[in-house]
């Protein structure tokens, strides 16, 4: 897919759009509709955070600590700590294209305005994609069930000026990569840390890239098989349309 700029407007992404950003380095921008959606949602979260009411994920602990109240002046520290505590992946780093796919999928999710994050968060992710800052994300640490928590935590730490990243084909501290690219890291406010890791964007990225590869392989298989049939001067009676209509399999019919 060739597209100069992918504008995230709060709608869903197609597989080819993810691949365009992940592999072809298509630029990403955040549309005005998405900015309004995110700002409206963040206004609600901020109102809850300043109301004095205990609300999970905003001013409480997480999991077993859900009944522990967190003081308002420690909410940024709370959100940073959930990123640091979950950045526990191991193994070889994921390929750059997988991480870039994660980044655009995460940005698109935030742009829906249902996560309560500020527009700046998605805008920084887009800026990282456009300037070539790619977080180093270990390949092991998630099965994509209740969320790719560890991989996304490694990604989000770079967004916040921590962790490790690739920039200019060199691995360096996330803070240095952001600095060299001229990107200002964010300091996550209420709920943003949770919003950054509570998703299955790694699995979705891997699936998008795998589907693109499968489509290419299927086309190659069909073409090479047709050429082999022609070269061998084999019969083509097995391609009779009536046979394949009887099977009611759309893929089989298309190949035939």
Please report, for each region that a protein language model flagged, where it lies by residue.
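Conserved, well-structured ligand/cofactor-binding cores
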Residues: 1-256
């Amino acid at each position: 897919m060739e597209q100069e700029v992918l504008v995230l407007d709060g709608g869903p992404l197609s597989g080819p759009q993810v691949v365009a950003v992940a592999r072809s380095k298509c630029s990403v921008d955040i549309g005005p509709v998405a900015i309004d959606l995110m700002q409206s949602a963040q206004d609600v979260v901020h109102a809850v955070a300043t109301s004095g009411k205990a609300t999970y994920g905003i001013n409480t602990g997480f999991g077993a600590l859900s009944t522990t109240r967190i003081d308002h002046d420690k909410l940024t520290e709370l959100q940073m700590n959930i990123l640091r505590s979950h950045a526990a992946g191991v193994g070889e780093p994921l390929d750059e294209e997988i991480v870039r796919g994660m980044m655009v999928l995460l940005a698109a999710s935030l742009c829906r305005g249902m996560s309560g994050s500020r527009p700046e968060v998605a805008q920084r992710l887009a800026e990282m994609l456009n300037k070539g800052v790619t977080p180093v994300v270990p390949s092991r640490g998630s099965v994509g069930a209740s969320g790719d928590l560890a991989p996304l935590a490694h990604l989000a730490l770079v967004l916040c000026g921590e962790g490790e990243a690739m920039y200019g084909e060199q691995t360096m501290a996330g803070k240095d990569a952001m600095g060299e690219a001229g990107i200002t890291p964010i300091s996550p406010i209420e709920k943003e840390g949770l919003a950054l890791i509570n998703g299955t964007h790694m699995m979705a990225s891997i699936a998008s890239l795998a589907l693109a590869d499968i489509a290419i392989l299927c086309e190659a298989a069909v073409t090479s098989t047709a050429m082999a049939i022609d070269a061998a001067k084999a019969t083509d009676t097995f391609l009779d349309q009536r046979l394949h209509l009887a099977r009611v399999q759309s893929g089989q019919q298309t190949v035939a």
